[in-house]
Amino acid sequence: MHLVPGRSNIDYSIDFNESLARHMNTVRRARTEDIPSILELLLQVDMVHHNGRPDLFKGNATKYNAEELVAIIENEKTPLFVCVDEENTVLAHMFCIIKQELNDSVITDIKTLYIDDICVDEKARGLGVGRTMFQFIKDYAKEEGFYNITLNVWCCNPDAMKFYEAMGMEPQKIGMEMLL
């Protein structure tokens, strides 16, 4: 990887290490024993957002607590996936929500897989874990008959935006704000 001043230093091209990482890692549904690791990843996500928008994100917090994670894991409408290595160490998580508007007067009856939260552990970044997770979720969504995959990404996280674009995602809608 070449470091370029003023640009993202994340390389999204596949290399030997990434191919190797894909063979050693497994994506599966999260289990209750994964909760401590998921909470650690949620802290990492929060700090990325806090560093980018401290006016909105408190920092050193998690989006969900352990009790809420148990409910998410048990709910079929909120599939939560983790990527683990050969020692069953959680390297990444992906929270999903199944969305479908039925009989809406304007919106068609499509079934959407919404990615609510995704994080690759800081120590596992650059090893293809994110690509492995994303390929898994694409395959899962196709097999389950979803029309599309959607997510929201904060503008203060340009590396994530570049990653999603590299995965083939395109902007669907844009949220805007005016600070007062």
Would you name each region that the model predicts?
Residues E67-V82:
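A short helix-loop-beta-strand connector motif used in the catalytic cores of GNAT acetyltransferases and
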Residues T150-A160, E177-L180:
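Conserved beta-strand-loop-alpha-helix junction that forms the acyl-donor binding cleft
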Residues R131, Q135, E143, C155-K173:
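Conserved active-site alpha-helix within GNAT-family acetyltransferase domains
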Residues T26-E40:
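A short beta-loop-alpha structural element at the N-terminal edge
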Residues M47-L69:
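Conserved GNAT-fold acetyl-CoA-binding loop/helix
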Residues D117-V120, G126-D139, A166:
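Conserved acetyl-CoA-binding loop-helix of GNAT-fold acetyltransferases
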Residues V82, T89-I98, Y114, C119:
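Conserved beta-strand in the GNAT
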Residues A141-N152:
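Conserved GNAT acetyl-CoA-binding A-motif
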